[in-house]
């Protein structure tokens, strides 16, 4: 199991209602959350005061929540909705029976006033046993600590080689969108019966694949 520095530990149970009572959550999403989540614990507070690192330009605190799930299905859409409204960066440690995984919604501030977040992309590790789950809190400031966490959780899901996290995630999303376009176009070509139209679609496919190289 991941061992957070003693100075960061909170270990405070959080009522499930605390996650959505002040949010505009529709009844269906609220029920999904209730049906999926067994319990929530505020595990750790990662901040300059608890990690002895400098404050970040965009990241000031990372709240670590341990969420015990009732089943293997992760309610990602619910966690994204709630996380978008939370005024801090977060890391979720998910548990189902004896299996664990990490989930982070990579966030960026929506505006210069830092009034709310945009969830750019969600990353999740695979399920594993507690003794095999690891995480290093590396960095001289909170921005670097958060960047290191996201990169560790994302692993090979970040396909860009850019060192800057913002750029790497943005390029990864572009690459994913391009691969989806290629797959959709290949499926369309397979169904097309008119030779001329099939040729035109194939030419489009060649250009898309060139951009994907």
Q: Where would I find each of the regions flagged by the language model?
A:
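N-terminal/domain-start segments enriched in small and hydrophobic, helix-friendly residues
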Residues: 1-8, 14, 115-117, 121-123, ...
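Alpha-helical oligomerization segments
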Residues: 162, 168-213
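Short, flexible coil/linker segments at or flanking structured domains
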Residues: 7-8, 21, 30, 80, ...
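Detector for Asparagine
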Residues: 22, 26, 105, 114, ...
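N-terminal, leucine/charged-rich tether regions that mediate assembly and partner docking
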Residues: 1-97
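Generic signature of intrinsically disordered, low-complexity segments enriched in small/polar residues
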Residues: 7, 22-23, 36, 68, ...
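Extended assembly-interface/linker segments at domain junctions
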Residues: 75-161
């Amino acid at each position: 199991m991941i061992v957070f520095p003693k100075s960061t530990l909170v270990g405070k149970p959080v009522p499930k209602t605390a996650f959505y009572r002040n949010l505009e959550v529709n009844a269906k999403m609220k029920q999904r959350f209730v049906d999926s989540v067994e319990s929530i614990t505020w595990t750790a507070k990662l901040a300059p005061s608890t990690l002895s690192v400098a404050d970040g330009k965009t990241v000031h605190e990372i709240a670590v929540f341990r969420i015990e799930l009732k089943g293997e299905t992760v309610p990602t859409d619910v966690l994204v909705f709630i996380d978008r409204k939370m005024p801090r960066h977060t890391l979720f440690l998910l548990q189902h029976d004896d299996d664990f995984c990490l989930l982070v919604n990579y966030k960026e501030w929506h505006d210069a006033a830092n009034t709310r977040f945009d969830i750019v992309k969600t990353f999740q590790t695979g399920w594993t046993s507690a003794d095999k789950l690891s995480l290093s809190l590396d960095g001289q400031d909170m921005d670097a600590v958060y960047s290191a966490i996201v990169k560790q959780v994302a692993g090979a899901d970040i396909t860009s080689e850019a060192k800057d996290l913002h750029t790497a995630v943005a390029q990864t999303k572009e690459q994913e969108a391009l691969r989806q376009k290629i797959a959709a176009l290949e499926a369309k070509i397979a169904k097309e019966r008119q030779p001329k139209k099939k040729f035109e679609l194939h030419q489009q496919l060649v250009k898309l694949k060139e951009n994907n190289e």
